[in-house]
Regions:
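Alpha-helix capping and helix-loop boundary segments enriched in small/acidic/polar residues
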Residues: 45, 108, 150-153, 171-179, ...
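Predominantly flavin-linked oxidoreductase catalytic cores and closely associated redox partners
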Residues: 1-128, 186, 190
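Flexible loop/turn segments at secondary-structure boundaries
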Residues: 29-31, 105-107, 147-150, 168-170, ...
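Short, conserved secondary-structure transition motifs
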Residues: 56-61, 138-142, 206-215
Length: 229
């Protein structure tokens, strides 16, 4: 009840025990952010940054469909002081993935990210693509955008952070599935070495820094900060 007393319908939560736990909750995971705070994993790092992304799947007319076509834009309808951009991916079966991302550090308190996305679709280039088409799916999600400068320490006693729990999204590409999967593979290798040879979990971060993920995020490190200069 409201006072914390167990009611007749109370059922205790499931207790999961493991020697090593991998946290892969995605952007701003509830447990991940608690662990980062508890173990001070972000000490000496830039504050993490976030955005909100909208995505729609459209079925368009055959004459406008160009399978494999990719469009990325920055700016309009946002002003020069607000970070954001769009993507249009022409998939198969006359479908496109259309989306817009806006950084949640925007200064205008009256800005509505959803409304800006709707306004974006009135741009002549985009309107021409979706005219006569049909929206068949839509959604929204938070994105982690701090990038290289905000990567926390990724290991702690008995646990590892992977994917967006660790902030591995490549912000300019608006892409994080590939880095999440690779970080999971590195975590698996680290766990096997720990269980077989009792190696320290700190080797996870060493392996991460030697991988292509680290190089990719380093190459993109100045894109997001450049919008604040």
């Amino acid at each position: 009840d409201k006072d914390g007393n167990k009611k007749d319908s109370f059922e205790p939560g499931i207790e999961l025990n493991g020697k090593i736990t991998v946290f892969a909750e995605g952007c701003r995971g509830h447990l991940g952010k608690e662990l980062i705070k508890k173990f001070n994993l972000d000490e000496g790092k830039d504050p993490q940054q976030y955005g909100i992304g909208f995505k729609e799947i459209w079925e368009i007319t055959e004459d406008k469909h160009e399978e494999g076509m990719v469009i990325h834009t920055a700016g309009w309808p946002l002003d020069n002081s607000t970070y954001g951009g769009s993507f249009v991916y022409h998939a198969e079966n006359k479908q496109i993935f259309l989306g817009y991302v806006i950084g949640l550090d925007y200064k205008n308190p009256y800005l509505s990210p959803f409304d800006e996305f709707q306004r974006f679709k009135t741009h002549p280039t985009i309107k021409k693509i979706i005219d006569g088409g049909k929206r068949i799916s839509y959604g929204a999600r938070a994105l982690i955008e701090g990038g290289f400068q905000s990567l926390p320490k990724m290991y702690m006693p008995g646990a590892l952070l992977i994917g967006c729990d660790a902030g591995t999204l490549n912000m300019p590409k608006i892409k994080g599935s590939h880095t999440a999967m690779k970080s999971g593979m590195i975590a698996a290798e680290t766990i096997m070495e720990n269980l077989k040879e009792n190696k320290s979990l700190s080797s996870y971060e060493d392996k991460f820094k030697k991988s292509w993920i680290y190089k990719e995020l380093y190459a993109a490190r100045n894109v997001k900060p450049s919008f604040s200069w």
